[in-house]
Design a protein with these regions (language model features):
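C-terminal substrate-binding/active-site "lid" region of AdoMet-derived donor-dependent transferases
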Residues: 181-238
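Glycine-rich SAM-binding Motif I of class I
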Residues: 108-112
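S-adenosyl-L-methionine
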Residues: 5-96, 133-168
Length: 238
């Protein structure tokens, strides 16, 4: 009887050991993949430069001041975090033909991050409020003066205007921080996206597109400035 109990205990300990080993092995493999990915894209260096650009920028305060005389729920401000956002972009096919747009680009973080890390043709931000737009333009000037980023900065541009009326015809990849977009604005934007023939991929936060032209293909959690939300990647249906 004692031998049976000892054998059973030994067996259970062995199973527990194998489970722990597999979990640790899986974690190590994941960390190795992340390290390889970061090294391949030179992310540590890009992240350091990105924080030099934006370390003294308070986009929330700039937005609050800009919205004093014009405010609505869709103007509530939020920002990307560099590494989580670049990881999100790695889930879509970005190449030298990609024209990236950020609708509601604020101080330009998503636009700058995209152009710094990926070989896009263009990286463009559209912002409604002049104060935020001006800040983004200043970050671009600062980036252009940094060693190794002259060519990347040439791909970046910022447009002061309403994303419901600005020309989006060349966009192939669009990012929308859509967490606070509702009602007529959200419906109008979905209608616009449907009419863009070059557009192949749309990334939204917190909710999916309400469109028959785009199919949801991936859902992932992403760290944003206000917390963790779901990001949704949509592809145009053929």
């Amino acid at each position: 009887m004692l031998d049976f109990i000892s054998s059973k205990t030994l067996f259970l300990c062995l199973i527990l050991f194998l489970i722990l080993f597999w979990l640790c092995f899986g974690k190590a493999r994941k960390e190795l993949r992340i390290n390889r990915w970061q090294k391949k894209l030179n992310l540590k260096h890009h992240a350091r430069i990105f924080h030099l650009l934006y370390g003294d920028v308070n986009g929330f305060m700039i937005s609050q001041q800009a919205r004093k005389n014009r405010d609505a729920i869709e103007y509530v401000y939020g920002e990307i975090e560099f590494l989580p956002f670049t990881a999100l972009l790695s889930m879509v096919n970005i190449d030298h033909n990609t024209v990236f747009y950020d609708l509601g680009s604020g101080t330009g973080k998503a636009v700058v991050a995209c152009a710094m890390v990926y070989p896009v043709h263009k990286s463009i931000g559209i912002e409604l409020f002049p104060n935020l737009h001006q800040c983004a333009c200043e970050r671009l000037q600062k980036l252009a003066a940094m060693e190794g980023y002259t060519e990347s900065s040439k791909k970046i541009s910022f447009i002061l205007g309403d994303f419901l009326t600005v020309d989006l015809s060349e966009a192939t990849l669009i990012f929308i921080n859509s967490s606070t977009l509702f009602g007529a604005t959200w419906e109008a934007l979905n209608t616009r996206l449907n009419s863009l023939p070059q557009l192949s991929t749309v990334i939204t936060t917190s909710k999916t597109l309400s469109s028959s032209r785009f199919k949801l293909v991936t859902r992932a959690k992403i760290q944003m400035s206000w917390g963790v939300v779901f990001a949704f990647i949509h592809k145009r249906e053929n």
